[in-house]
C-alpha cells in the first residue's frame, strides 16, 4: 500500500509539472458555419501576457454574443508558441499562449463552440534591422523599417518564412481561419523588385514620368497586387496539405485597407490591395472600416453599398470596426455611440461578418454598447 501511494504521488507530481494536456491545443472550430459572424480581436500583447484575465474576457464575449475570436499569433520573428523550426522566435519559450487563450474562450455561455482565427502579422522589423537588404525600398534610397520588399515576398526568405509559419499554425491548431495582416507593398523600387517586375510583366523598366522618376501607374499597382496574391496562393496550397487535407477547411483571410474617397469597392490599390485580384487567392478579405473619429457610419455603409453594387460576393467580406480614436497606435478609443453606429453600418448590404478590434481598448462602456447591437436581446 505504501509503495502504491508512493508511485501515485510521484505520478501526480510529474503530471503537475509536465501538464501534458496543456500541450494539446483545444478544438478551434465549430461544426456548421454560423449564419452571422460576430468576432472580437485579441491583440498579441494580451494573448502573451501571463496576467491576462481570460475569465473576464470570456464573460464579456458572452455578454455581446461573440461567436468567433481572432487571436494575435505574432510574427515570424516573434511567435506565440514554440515553433520547432525557429525556437529562438518564441515570445516565451515553453509557453503556448494560443492554446491557453483558446482553452479559456472556446465555449460560449450556452455551451456552443466558438470559432477561432489566428492573425499573422507580416511585419519583420527585427529581420530588417539585422539585414536591411530585405526591406522594401524607395527610389530615393529610403528603406522601410517594417515591410519586406516585393522580391522578398515573392522569391526570398521572408516570403518562404511567412508561408512556413502559416502552415505551422494550421498544422498545430487547425483553426477555422488564418488571417494575414500588415501585408502592404508601399515601397517597391529596389533593384531586386525591378527584376521581379520585369520577370512578371515582361517590361524592360519601370514606367517613368517625364522627369525620369518611377511612375506608379496602373501596371505597377496591379503588379503589387499580383505579388501579394502569389504569396497568398502559396499559403493556400500549404494549408491544403495540412493533416492529409484537413487544412483545406481552414479559411485564408487577409486584412485590407480601404479607399475611402475614390473607389471603395476596388480597394487600396497603392498598397497592393486590389480586392478583385486578392480574392483569386484569399477566401476572405477583412476590410479595415476604421472610423478613427474622421469617418462616419454613413461612410462605412458606403463601403458595403459599393461592394454590393460592384457585384461582389458579400459572404467573402468581413467588415472590421477599429476602436482607435485617431491612429492604430493610439491608446484612446472611439465613443460607445460611434461604436454602436459603426457596427450597425458595417452589417449592411448583405455583410454577415463583422469584427471589432482590439480587445485591449474595450472598457465596460464599450462592452455595454456592443451588447446593444450584438447581444441576445438585439437578435
Residue ranges and their predicted role:
Residues 84-90, 124-147, 182-211:
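Aromatic- and acidic-residue-enriched segments that line the glycan-binding/catalytic groove
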Residues 53-79, 171-177, 277-286, 346-354:
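Catalytic domains of carbohydrate-active enzymes, especially glycoside hydrolases
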Residues 60, 149-185, 231, 274-278, ...:
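An active-site-proximal structural segment forming one wall of the substrate-binding cleft
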Residues 33-37, 48, 115-172, 210, ...:
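Active-site-adjacent "subsite" loops/lids of carbohydrate-active enzymes
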Residues 41, 115-123, 179-186, 214-270, ...:
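Aromatic-lined carbohydrate-recognition surfaces of secreted/lumenal glycan-active proteins
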Amino acid at each position: 500500500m505504501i509503495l502504491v501511494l508512493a508511485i501515485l504521488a510521484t505520478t501526480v507530481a510529474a503530471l503537475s509539472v509536465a501538464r501534458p494536456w496543456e500541450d494539446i491545443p483545444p478544438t478551434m472550430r465549430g461544426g456548421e458555419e454560423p449564419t452571422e459572424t460576430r468576432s472580437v480581436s485579441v491583440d498579441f500583447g494580451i494573448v502573451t501576457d501571463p496576467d491576462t484575465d481570460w475569465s473576464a474576457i470570456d464573460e464579456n464575449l458572452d455578454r455581446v454574443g461573440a461567436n468567433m475570436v481572432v487571436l494575435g499569433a505574432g510574427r515570424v520573428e516573434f511567435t506565440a508558441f514554440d515553433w520547432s523550426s525557429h525556437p529562438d522566435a518564441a515570445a516565451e519559450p515553453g509557453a503556448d499562449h494560443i492554446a491557453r487563450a483558446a482553452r479559456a474562450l472556446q465555449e460560449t455561455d450556452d455551451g456552443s463552440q466558438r470559432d477561432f482565427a489566428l492573425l499573422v502579422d507580416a511585419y519583420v522589423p527585427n529581420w530588417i534591422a539585422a539585414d536591411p537588404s530585405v526591406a522594401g525600398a524607395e527610389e530615393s534610397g529610403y528603406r522601410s523599417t517594417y515591410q519586406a520588399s516585393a522580391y522578398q515576398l515573392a522569391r526570398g526568405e521572408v516570403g518562404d518564412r511567412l508561408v512556413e509559419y502559416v502552415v505551422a499554425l494550421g498544422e498545430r491548431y487547425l483553426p477555422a481561419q488564418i488571417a494575414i495582416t500588415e501585408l502592404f507593398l508601399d515601397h517597391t523600387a529596389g533593384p531586386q523588385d525591378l527584376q521581379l517586375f520585369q520577370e512578371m510583366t515582361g517590361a524592360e523598366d519601370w514606367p517613368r514620368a517625364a522627369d525620369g522618376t518611377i511612375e506608379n501607374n496602373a501596371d505597377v499597382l496591379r503588379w503589387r497586387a499580383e505579388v501579394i496574391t502569389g504569396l497568398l496562393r502559396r499559403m493556400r496550397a500549404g494549408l491544403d496539405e495540412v493533416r492529409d487535407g484537413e487544412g483545406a477547411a481552414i479559411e485564408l483571410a487577409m486584412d485590407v485597407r480601404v479607399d475611402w474617397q475614390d473607389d471603395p469597392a476596388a480597394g487600396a490599390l497603392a498598397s497592393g490591395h486590389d480586392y478583385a485580384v486578392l480574392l483569386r487567392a484569399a477566401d476572405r478579405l477583412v476590410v479595415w472600416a476604421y472610423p478613427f473619429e474622421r469617418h462616419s457610419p454613413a461612410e462605412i455603409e458606403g463601403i458595403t453599398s459599393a461592394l454590393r453594387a460592384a457585384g461582389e460576393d458579400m459572404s467573402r467580406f468581413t467588415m472590421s470596426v477599429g476602436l482607435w480614436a485617431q491612429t492604430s497606435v493610439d491608446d484612446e478609443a472611439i465613443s460607445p455611440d460611434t461604436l454602436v453606429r459603426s457596427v450597425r453600418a458595417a452589417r449592411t448590404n448583405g455583410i454577415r461578418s463583422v469584427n471589432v478590434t482590439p480587445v485591449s481598448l474595450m472598457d465596460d462602456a464599450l462592452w455595454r454598447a456592443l451588447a446593444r447591437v450584438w447581444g441576445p436581446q438585439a437578435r
